Structures are given as structure tokens and as C-alpha cells.
Amino acid sequence: MLAEYRTVAQEAEITLVEKKSKFIARIKPVESREEAEAFVEEVRKIHWSATHNVPAYIIGINQEVQKYSDDGEPSGTAGLPVLEVLKANEVVNAAIVVTRYFGGILLGRGGLVRAYGGAAREALTTAGIVRMVPAQEAAITVDYVHGGRVQNELLSRNVSLSGIEYLERITFRVLLMPGEREALRQLIQEITANAFTWQDGREVYRAIPLEAEK
């Protein structure tokens, strides 16, 4: 049984400048500790000459794996503020690396916390957050005479339609949210006078966009 969770919608990168220091925050959805570490290493290779590359990531629906590093910044001023951005927005299966190129002016503990946290927050906002909601795949097959009305009903009800196959009959491949199955099945039965076939498929995730909240 799949469980709902939040994650980052896509990879993104932003740049902020704070008192001549440049902060580059890059965020990416990841599925495992290994993928997260590979992403962190990739950023380190790109920004090998940077003063600091500060990583943070959370893996697992229940936040089973949490890791961050200050990478030489004063303890608690860099990695933890980045991690807290993910936690505050309940985002998992995501990794962030905030790269700093020192500009010659010290920011102080408070300034570092604001800069690293702010860069991570802007990266998350740019990438976007999605709710990963359990959904049910289904294939609905009807005669051509009913195809137009069935398709119109699917569209009018905002049912997620992943594909249509035109063979001897028409097959609509849909992705159903919890609670949609029985009502839709009854509707198709009424439209076709029970002349349809319904095949349930896998339970999968459907991504629903959200905005970063904190």
C-alpha cells in the first residue's frame, strides 16, 4: 500500500549574492542515499574551487535518512538551516547543495543562517513541491459508438487520461485518485448499457503541484 508524501517537482538552481558572497543553491529529487551522494559529489566537482559546498538531504517517506554538513562553516550555520527548509515544508526524497564563493566580507552566524537558509528556500520555491498521491491505473474499453461521450465525461470530470488506444474497440487508460473508481465505473456502465470492460492496473503515484509554504 503506497503512502502519500511530498517531494521536489524538478531539479532547479538559483543564485543569490549576500555582501559580495555568491550562494548557488541546487536542488534535485532523489530516491536513495546513493543517488543523493552522487548528486552532492557532482556539485562538488562542478564547483571544486568554491569556498564551501554545503549539502543536505532527506530520504524516505518517514524521513528515515537525514544528512547535512556545514563543510567548514561554523557549526549549525549552514547545513542545518538548509535541512530545516526541507523539514519545514515536509519534503522528502530531495537533496540540496548550497555552494558559497566567499566575497571577502564576514557574514556572522546570523547572516550565514539567513543566507544558506534563504538560498535553499528560493531553490525549493523555484523547483516547486508536489504531493505524491497514491493512484490506481485502470483500462476502460468501450465500443466506438460510446467513445466520444466517454471521453467527454473523463475530460469534464478532470480524470487523468494517460492514453487512448484505437483498435477493434477504444481503450481509455486512466489514473484514478482515491474515491474516483466506483463513481466512474457506474457512469461508464450507464453510458454503455454495461457494454464495457474494466481492467484495474498497478497502484502508482500521481504528482499534484503545491507551493513552498515556509
What are these regions (language model features)?
Residues 1-76, 181, 197-214:
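C-terminal regulatory domains involved in ligand/effector binding and gene-expression control
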Residues 141-159:
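Short amphipathic alpha-helix segments
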Residues 174-183:
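Terminal, non-globular segments
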Residues 128-146, 174:
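Short glycine-/aliphatic-rich beta-strand segments at the starts of folded cytosolic domains
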Residues 150-155, 183-192:
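Short amphipathic alpha-helices in soluble, non-transmembrane regions
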Residues 53-55, 129-137, 164-169, 197-202:
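Interdomain boundary/hinge elements
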Residues 47-50, 157-162, 189-197:
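A common structural junction motif
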Residues 78-126:
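Active-site beta-strand/loop microenvironment that shapes enzyme catalytic pockets
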